[in-house]
């Protein structure tokens, strides 16, 4: 049997538990487990109580003074009225003290703490159960330890300082360690998971239990924890140590403001609560609370330090910069038992209790407040790179956040400026993951290194060239050398003055410059055509299709015109007869004559001016107008083109409406085709151009045109370089030109080769490329 366990005889059990009631006690063979809460007795008389026994044992109330803990309510046989209340009252859930000198001693029963109180009868709400007794004696009471099984509570505990709901009974025997519920049934038979729960709260006191009485003005109570922290469950992953305060001196009125500061004693186990008028000596009580999840230790627990005056500063400070000193314990964080003992206003008690509970609240450890943590539905974003920051507080209270550089200590207002600064540090460049094997290039991205290596491959290809002996041109292949040594053919654009020596460059020029006039592009070679029929003929070159065959030989062609040319050149002697209407050829004269009769029979409309016949009147009319009429009475107003009939003029005018007309600046010529306009200017106005603009090199036929053009330049501001003929309209470009070309002052010098640079970033890049090994050494 442990030294903390005692064995009671049947007579002692009967005398001990008769006052509690048979229904509240469950006897298990020879042992019984009882959890005895701290009981505080108040008396306003000067009567000394020794070995007191209650006159009415059925009305005994065992009350706990520790906040947020379930208490034991022993059902009484009857309830007393408020009129029966005498001077001796037991106040539940409050820490009270003697207003006058009291000597309290219990035989074999140790009272851990007795605190002072200034609660008056006017501001006190009386509980439901009140004990009236002139002399209370308790004898033959064994030594018990207070054990708080917080893990057995499956719901959130809500405690009112003055009106607590006394409904549940949790009784435990230190000897048997069996837990009973309100009905007397052991809880371990109900649910093994509840007993094996890791979350519990264990309180340990500092010094051996003793009661000191030093006159009528002070009552000091010191106790020792007989439960060592080493007795905790070995499987517990984490133990959180929480410090609370206890008072051991008598103060009738502490005041409205209580400040707790660290005592300057050598032992370091006591804190001192000071006020302008009083001083209270407060020993510490250590409470160990088990945290069920050790993986939660990486998460930060928000701690708010300070009272109402410091609230603004704590709110302005970021969470990761708020620190808490154990020595700075404010009055707002006093336990509710203390606040109840020194304050008459219960509303202020609740406010201070809420603040105090926030210190003991730990979501991850599963402590007293069992509020289920809601799972966030938001997806976790990838953590960005964190940068250290510092806050400067001005004398007027304003704060300024800056971001210092980890290499040189230079401070910046924003993260963007800090990032740009760090990228130019040699230390940062040396820590890059990927380095080029050909040069000093380094990067943290693999794709960037891949793109950089591709540039090296292109450089290697361009270096493998052959120089032509005639024109000193670098050629990549030997075959190109033979082609280049051939005839220097010049390819000219038929729409403008562009000239090139390669056909591919000319095709590229046509696609880029004259693409609008060539909407039909070949998918194989990129050549453009104006009409889809021309593209269709061109595609046959790539496919090899030759639909046109010669009837005299095996010749095939992709174009009908090529076939006709072939027949005329190769088979002219074999075709003596040819129809003049349908261009059919015949080898026999009779066949040709029979074919001509067919044309004569079909044409019944004879022309009056010639022997022409038509199959219908419309064809005959068209023949007369086009052949025998030289006048064009219907002319276009835009281009002065003439037509024989008004219908033809109407169709022609529609083409002008759908197209934009381009006016020649030298004459009245207009054309919907810009290429025709360019051809007109080159042919009609480029022979003699006496007037030329000195700024834009534009040419004019007349001097008035040049003067009008010069006005457009005068309205724009031109920046002329004083060292050279460079001029520009861009101010930033002009400044960049002067600095880069005409400025010899290079403020940023290399420490190794004394080479100058205009910007620090250029100097750092130079060091990493040419002095990397020296810089790292």
UniProtKB/Swiss-Prot annotation:
Task: Give the Basic residues compositional bias ranges.
Answer: 373-382
Where along the sequence does the record place the motif called Nuclear localization signal? 372-382
Residue spans with biased composition (Basic and acidic residues)?
207-216, 361-372
One Gene Ontology cellular component term attached to this UniProt record is: nucleus
Write one Pfam family the protein is assigned to: zf-C2H2
* Matching InterPro entries: Transcrp_activ_Zfx/Zfy-dom, Zinc_finger/UBP_domain, Znf_C2H2_sf, Znf_C2H2_type
* SMART domains according to UniProt: ZnF_C2H2 (SM00355)
Q: What segment(s) does the record annotate as region Disordered?
A: 207-234, 361-389
Give the ZnF (C2H2-type) ranges.
403-425, 434-456, 491-514, 520-542, 548-571, 577-599, 605-628, 634-656, 662-685, 691-713, 719-742, 748-770
The superkingdom of the source organism is Eukaryota
* Subcellular location(s) of the protein: Nucleus
Task: Tell me which family the UniProt entry assigns to this protein.
Answer: Belongs to the krueppel C2H2-type zinc-finger protein family. ZFX/ZFY subfamily.
Q: Give the protein name, as stated in the record.
A: Zinc finger Y-chromosomal protein 2
Q: What is the lineage of its organism?
A: Eukaryota, Metazoa, Chordata, Craniata, Vertebrata
